[in-house]
């Protein structure tokens, strides 16, 4: 079965974000549906809530079936001590849609988050399906990443899949954060669900770390990076001028401040780095930038 229209994950009460999404998609004459994001509570309350939070009745039926089949995954995610509450809710929201893709036999799903900004000619990619069907087998395990996080990443050029609308399908070979926009094949949805079924709760990671980092080097699992990208998170595009607050980002920043106790070697290395920075801050910054960029590039947004 062909996929449904573009799905945007959004909390039901996120008024400003929903206005933002409506403006973005309507400006491109794109149809879309909101998927009410999973709100972290106790697992039993959340399951009952999730059944009622959906795009339409058919999706409710799919979610009900998915939950009945996947309680172990939901409980594992809830028990994770690594993830913040926001990260748990985000992962489960994406997971429920992957389950929908499999249970309703969709060839693929186009999934977005409610802080996405769409670029030039995004409608050509998101309104049409022929370019997808002529280039990809949806039984294969692949994700097409439509987004850039504007971070240095390793990309492998390939010639098997031709460009479309002057954008290449490069193969992602390193971490690339964010899940604001991607297309997942049914084959990939099955693979990621099966992966989650077979790992303990202490190995569960955030959704972007899972599909765009942890699995990137796995054989037969391919992430195609659309290059240049057709979408970006509003926070990444506008930085300090961002108007859409992110509770998830605040949680992550708070967690990053909780530092682990360092070894003597690590402390001495840090002291050395501080001295170098103090003596020649500009030179040190340039060295760090060059080191980070070796063999990498920043995927442009346009």
Swiss-Prot record:
Residues 42-69 are annotated as: 7 X 4 AA tandem repeats of S-I-N-Q. Changing residue 29 to N: In strain: DL42 and RM 7004. GO terms for molecular function: glycosyltransferase activity. Changing residue 274 to D: In strain: RM 7004. InterPro entries: Glyco_trans_25 (IPR002654). Involved in extracellular lipooligosaccharide (LOS) biosynthesis and virulence expression. Involved in the synthesis of the oligosaccharide moiety of the LOS molecule by adding GalNAc. This is Lipooligosaccharide biosynthesis protein lex-1. The gene is lex1.
